[in-house]
Every structure is written in structure tokens, then in C-alpha cells.
């Protein structure tokens, strides 16, 4: 049997409907920057969607992933995995298969470095850590959060 992932989900309600209908996974994505510039950013929609499906199915993030720090942020906001598009195509255009391999190596190395700088030893650990957002809120376990003032701790899940 083939797994079916529902893509283009930005709403927790849509994610719930997809899971109830039998989706094997959710891809949080939009068409911003191509067809609809002013839609909700995938990264902004991710926490609410991930919380709604509550680990019943994998949640993937598509859109805006350019570096390892982007991957880490997505993991901390609830993604189980990310999809890479443009960076891989840029590598392909520049150096073919070797370019694609190099892009993937760079993203992996940046992810490892960002995890080390955050004191995170594994992807699973990253998913349970606190992420500080400069919009005045903290996502993650408020017991782990030690944000500098004036940020406030709020629960993510």
C-alpha cells in the first residue's frame, strides 16, 4: 500500500480533517512567493498544525528551508521532517549530482552545528526543546525556558 500525504495544509482544522479521512501524513506548505505572496507562511502555521495532529501522523514542513538552522527551527516547532526544493535545484544547476550532494552535506553540517550551539544532541531531543521567538513569546516547555526579559514563556504543546 502506498502512503498518502496531504500537502498544502496551513490550518489545524484542515489537518484534522485530513487525518480523519485517512491521510498518512501532513505537509504544511503554501504557495507564497510563487502564486500567493500574502498567505500564511508555512513556518508560522506549523506549531498549530503539529499540535492538532498530536503525533498521530508525521508532519513535514515545505517551504523556506535554506539552511540547517531552518531545519532546527522546524523541528523545534513540531515538524518531523522538512522538504528541500530550491537549494537542491541550485546545487544541481551548478554541479549536477555532486552539487546536490554538497548542498545536502552543507545543510546537515549546519544542522549539527546549530544543534551543538543549542546544546541539543539529537533530532529527537531538538523536538522537545524550547524555541525562543522574538515576537514576545516562547514556544516549548515553559519549565525549560529561561528567556531574557521581556519575553514571556507560553506552552507550545
Cite the ranges covered by each PLM segment.
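C-terminal extensions of enzymes
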Residues: 88-89, 95-157
Amino acid at each position: 500500500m502506498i502512503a498518502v500525504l496531504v500537502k498544502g495544509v496551513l490550518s489545524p482544522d484542515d489537518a484534522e480533517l485530513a487525518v480523519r479521512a485517512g491521510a498518512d501524513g501532513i505537509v504544511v506548505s503554501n504557495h507564497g512567493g510563487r502564486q500567493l505572496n500574502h498567505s500564511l507562511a508555512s513556518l508560522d502555521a506549523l506549531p498549530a498544525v503539529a499540535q492538532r495532529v498530536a503525533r498521530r501522523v508525521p508532519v513535514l514542513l515545505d517551504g523556506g528551508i535554506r539552511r540547517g538552522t531552518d531545519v532546527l527551527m522546524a523541528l523545534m516547532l513540531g515538524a518531523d521532517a522538512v522538504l528541500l526544493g530550491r537549494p537542491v535545484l541550485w546545487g544541481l544547476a551548478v554541479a549536477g549530482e555532486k552539487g546536490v550532494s554538497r548542498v545536502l552535506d552543507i545543510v546537515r553540517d549546519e544542522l549539527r552545528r546549530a544543534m551543538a550551539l543549542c546544546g541539543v544532541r539529537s533530532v529527537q531531543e531538538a523536538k522537545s526543546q524550547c524555541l525562543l521567538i522574538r515576537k514576545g513569546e516562547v514556544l516549548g516547555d515553559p519549565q525549560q525556558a529561561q528567556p531574557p526579559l521581556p519575553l514571556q514563556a507560553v506552552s507550545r504543546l
